[in-house]
């Protein structure tokens, strides 16, 4: 079964993999996430990147604080991302390609049983 058209909206997702890389072009460090969503009973993978350099992206700081992934020394433990579900907002760009516009930690009561993997 194939998904022919993924509708824009909010889906339940989990972090499948992550890595950190420094861009050769900009010199900035990025957290690259592979997020798997449950769309109509099928698993679909998306990529989402966050800049980790100071002052560049407050969104990832909020996510890491929500998953208790920041210690007293302000070091991030990205492994804690694996322990949570996320609300993944999918929209389409001008070229008609779906992408993640927003990623938020889902509270336990926000995750429906049929959305679990």
Task: Identify the residue ranges that each predicted region occupies.
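Short beta-rich binding modules
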Residues: 1-117
């Amino acid at each position: 079964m194939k998904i022919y058209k993924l509708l824009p909206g909010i889906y339940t997702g989990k972090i499948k993999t992550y890595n950190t890389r420094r861009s050769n072009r900009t010199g900035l460090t990025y957290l690259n996430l592979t997020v798997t969503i449950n769309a109509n009973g099928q698993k679909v993978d998306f990529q989402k990147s966050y800049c980790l350099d100071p002052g560049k992206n407050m969104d990832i700081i909020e996510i890491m604080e929500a998953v208790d992934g920041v210690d007293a020394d302000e070091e991030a433990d990205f492994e804690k991302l694996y322990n949570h579900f996320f609300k993944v907002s999918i929209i389409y760009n001008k070229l008609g390609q779906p992408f993640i516009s927003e990623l938020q930690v889902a509270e336990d009561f926000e995750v429906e049983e049929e959305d679990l993997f």
